[in-house]
């Protein structure tokens, strides 16, 4: 019974989302648990190293013809640049483009690294992603208040609203605005979490199925093909969700800058 429970725990599809401690820092006098080296810390460093390595590899060394790494970076750069320009008009886009581009690259690389089997998904951590989206939302709100002052609150009163409907619409618009802080990150985290959970469950069922006998071993290639198809879809979702997160952040930033 104990061995069965142990196998169930080890093979749990949710185990891939657990934060495990590699190096704990504890003293009898001071609580240093916040400095522990965990899977979250390790994969954050890996993401930063991969992003930095991409820029090193894309260094053209003054060559006329760019390398494939450089071309790939230029495609990503131009895509995000055009997206930010489309959202934020005028000259203001230049101030916020580095932030949106960095945000996109971090989420994109985090999503792609999480597609490696037995790896850790940073963006599937609800606390981290929702905290990130709340910080972005709070920063945009402070920026808008600093730029517009009391006029900022006109954002919650749609133009042309009849006076008797103003209190109701203000409450609705306020709730909608506050919900952005959660929906921005929840959308990303829920998609990555559900996709990885689905692949883990299907992989576990397939592994159990092919171990029954030789006949099921042969038939096991069918669910394996399905898993590979789902994995390809997850790669697409990983890229799309990074772009969606960035474009929504740009859209919210536009609303804060121009109050519409």
UniProtKB/Swiss-Prot annotation:
> Cellular location of this protein?
Mitochondrion inner membrane
| GO process annotations (BP) | proton motive force-driven ATP synthesis
Keyword S-adenosyl-L-methionine attributed: no
Q: Name one GO molecular function term.
A: proton-transporting ATP synthase activity, rotational mechanism
The cross-references to SUPFAM superfamilies, in alphabetical order and at most eight, read: F1F0 ATP synthase subunit A
Q: Which UniProt keywords apply?
A: ATP synthesis, CF(0), Hydrogen ion transport, Ion transport, Membrane, Mitochondrion, Mitochondrion inner membrane, Transmembrane, Transmembrane helix, Transport
User: Which residues would be cut away as propeptide?
Assistant: 1-11
Q: Name one Pfam family in it.
A: ATP-synt_A
Give an example GO cellular component term for this record: mitochondrial inner membrane
- Residues passing through the membrane, by range: 37-57, 96-116, 126-146, 152-172, 192-212, 217-237
Membrane topology per the entry is: Multi-pass membrane protein
Q: Which domain of life is it from?
A: Eukaryota
The family line of this record is: Belongs to the ATPase A chain family.
Q: Self-association or partners: how does it assemble? A: F-type ATPases have 2 components, CF(1) - the catalytic core - and CF(0) - the membrane proton channel. CF(1) has five subunits: alpha(3), beta(3), gamma(1), delta(1), epsilon(1). CF(0) has three main subunits: a, b and c.
Task: Quote the function comment for this protein.
Answer: Mitochondrial membrane ATP synthase (F(1)F(0) ATP synthase or Complex V) produces ATP from ADP in the presence of a proton gradient across the membrane which is generated by electron transport complexes of the respiratory chain. F-type ATPases consist of two structural domains, F(1) - containing the extramembraneous catalytic core and F(0) - containing the membrane proton channel, linked together by a central stalk and a peripheral stalk. During catalysis, ATP synthesis in the catalytic domain of F(1) is coupled via a rotary mechanism of the central stalk subunits to proton translocation.
Entry protein name: ATP synthase subunit a
**Organism lineage:** Eukaryota, Fungi, Dikarya, Ascomycota, Saccharomycotina
